[in-house]
Amino acid sequence: MNQAAQTVATISAEALRQTARNTHALPEDARWRVDDVAALFALPFNDLLFRAQQVHRENFDANTVQLSTLLSIKTGGCEEDCGYCPQSAHHDAGVKAEKLMELDEVLEAARAAKANGATRFCMGAAWRSPKDRHLEPVMDMVREVKAMGLETCVTLGMLKAEQAQQLKDAGLDYYNHNLDTSPEFYGKIITTRTYQDRLDTIGHVRDAGINVCCGGIVGMGESREARAGLIAQLANMDPYPESVPINNLVQVEGTPLAGTEALDPFEFVRTIAVARITMPGAMVRLSAGREAMDEALQALCFMAGANSIFYGEKLLTTGNPQADRDRALLARLDIRAEGYAG
């Protein structure tokens, strides 16, 4: 472990779980109680998909998806110990720490993404939280990418209120900060950042007037109840996130979650469907893990209400289907890419 990683105080997993249970229990009058969400998960598969597709059609064109591209603008060396992440300095996953990319490199990637049909460009940096000196070059990236006509999103770790406002002033459209999992399961995955830390950052983003991109990861060994708990936390935000990425764990050798039993594919589709029903107006994004999904499974995810995919060869440090394969699949399903005449 490097010195940067050692500077972060580690909270015991049990303390995190206890705090999460006490602090983040949903009120009795919550819009979606965990039991209600769990009842959706328990519906017969066809009934659940039928209901999700109905909700989807009431809010979106069911045959259109948004293509998003995600670029790692600062890779590796992160001080956090997220058990799924190869970019953590706590894990020996073979990811080298790199410095922040230059503006010209980022703009070249953004131009290529737009030429390939993406209408949304996301930039991720492996920081616990950005230092103020890091923010100015990121704001330059946001301004220049936005000037290309692309929707902008960044994920930089925890933010202070004033940093969120600076990003808003730079024209940022979305800020991504995932909850990852339910409050109860959280301490088994991360011990260097509390659930409340995540909620505080989301609050700063919302207060600054930036759209919230917030979702989670499934397939980390959690129970169905934990998946229901994650969705309930998201759906009870006021308002719920405009953008909800659902990731299927990509297991990377050298991370603590390597070797975790894989999630049943139909359970992943159920998670997409439940997200669509509980957050009807959100963009539900089919995110990490798509490379391991066959075309039939991806088609079921679209039926369940997913209306965005991450597009390009890499998602931060993990693989993703080739753009040509994605275009061919969408064409076979008669699904149009938003804003792309291809």
UniProtKB/Swiss-Prot annotation:
[2Fe-2S] cluster binds at residues 122, 153, 213, 285. Keywords: 2Fe-2S, 4Fe-4S, Biotin biosynthesis, Iron, Iron-sulfur, Metal-binding, S-adenosyl-L-methionine, Transferase. It holds the Pfam family BATS. Pathway: Cofactor biosynthesis; biotin biosynthesis; biotin from 7,8-diaminononanoate: step 2/2. The keyword Lipoprotein does not apply. Binds 1 [4Fe-4S] cluster. The cluster is coordinated with 3 cysteines and an exchangeable S-adenosyl-L-methionine. Binds 1 [2Fe-2S] cluster. The cluster is coordinated with 3 cysteines and 1 arginine. Belongs to the radical SAM superfamily. Biotin synthase family. This is Biotin synthase. It comes from Cupriavidus pinatubonensis (strain JMP 134 / LMG 1197).
